[in-house]
Each structure stands twice: as structure tokens, then as C-alpha cells.
């Protein structure tokens, strides 16, 4: 029975798309990682809680098949903000979020990152230069 569960999860992982624009935050990649952790021994893995495992699979399968989208249809494909799905994908991409974080940095933080030494030995040398200067 564990082999059947493993194969069902593998099939679900194969069908679940991975969004490359969401590096480190994508549900498909996270799902693959969790399945690999849960079934370390592949088909030979002993499932401690078979009912919970089956329930999790069914929940993920419903999400993947858009069960709730069909059960609760929306009259329009818009949101409160009026943005389209493509615009949301662009806004929520990792690159755009990094750009927003860069824009929100203070001038002082930007200067620190630009001119501060990056390697520990360079930091040590910079501090010794500053501390060894004679005070006037």
C-alpha cells in the first residue's frame, strides 16, 4: 500500500508546475522537497499515519485539479485591485520583490553595501587602519 501512495504522490509532483519566477517560494518545488523527505526509501517507506497521508494527497489533488475554482466559480477574473493574473505574476516574482527591497533601502545602507569590505580579513584591516590613526 505504501508503494501505491508513493506512486500517487510522484504522479502529482510530475503534474504540479514549478514557477521559476518564484525561486525559493514556489509551492511545486516545496511539494517535491516534502515528498522526497517523507518517502526517503521510495516505495519501501513505511507510512506511520496512512489516513493522514491519504487525506493530504486528496487535499493536494483537489487543489491541483482546480476543484474549488469549479465549485465556486467567479463571474469575472479580476481582483479588488483590478490587476490581471499576468500582472500579479510579474509583481510577485522574486526579481520584482528584490527590486522593491533594493528601492526601499536607505541611502546609508546602499553606501555601506557599496563601499564596505566583503571579506572578513578586509574588514579586520579596515578597522586596524581606522583605530591606528593618530587623533588630532
Swiss-Prot record:
InterPro entries: UQCC2 (IPR037698). Residues 1-13 form a transit peptide. It holds the Pfam family UQCC2_CBP6. It comes from the Eukaryota. One of its GO terms (cellular component) is mitochondrial intermembrane space. GO terms for biological process: mitochondrial respiratory chain complex III assembly; positive regulation of mitochondrial translation; regulation of insulin secretion; regulation of oxidative phosphorylation; regulation of skeletal muscle cell differentiation. Its main location: mitochondrion. Keywords: Membrane, Mitochondrion, Mitochondrion inner membrane, Mitochondrion nucleoid, Transit peptide. It is found in: Mitochondrion matrix, Mitochondrion nucleoid; Mitochondrion; Mitochondrion intermembrane space; Mitochondrion matrix. Transmembrane segments: none annotated. Interacts with UQCC1. Required for the assembly of the ubiquinol-cytochrome c reductase complex (mitochondrial respiratory chain complex III or cytochrome b-c1 complex). Plays a role in the modulation of respiratory chain activities such as oxygen consumption and ATP production and via its modulation of the respiratory chain activity can regulate skeletal muscle differentiation and insulin secretion by pancreatic beta-cells. Involved in cytochrome b translation and/or stability. This is Ubiquinol-cytochrome-c reductase complex assembly factor 2. The lineage of its organism: Eukaryota, Metazoa, Chordata, Craniata, Vertebrata. The gene is Uqcc2.
Amino acid at each position: 500500500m505504501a508503494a501505491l501512495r508513493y506512486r500517487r504522490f510522484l504522479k502529482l509532483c510530475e503534474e504540479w508546475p514549478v514557477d521559476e519566477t518564484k525561486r525559493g517560494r514556489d509551492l511545486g518545488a516545496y511539494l517535491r522537497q516534502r515528498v522526497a523527505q517523507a518517502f526517503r526509501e521510495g516505495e519501501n517507506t513505511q507510512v506511520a499515519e496512512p489516513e493522514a497521508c491519504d487525506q493530504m494527497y486528496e487535499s493536494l489533488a483537489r487543489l491541483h485539479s482546480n476543484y474549488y475554482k469549479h465549485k465556486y466559480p467567479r463571474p469575472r477574473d479580476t481582483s479588488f485591485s483590478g490587476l490581471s493574473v499576468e500582472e500579479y505574476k510579474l509583481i510577485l516574482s522574486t526579481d520584482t520583490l528584490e527590486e522593491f527591497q533594493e528601492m526601499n533601502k536607505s541611502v546609508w545602507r546602499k553606501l555601506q553595501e557599496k563601499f564596505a569590505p566583503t571579506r572578513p580579513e578586509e574588514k579586520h584591516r579596515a578597522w586596524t587602519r581606522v583605530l591606528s590613526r593618530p587623533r588630532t
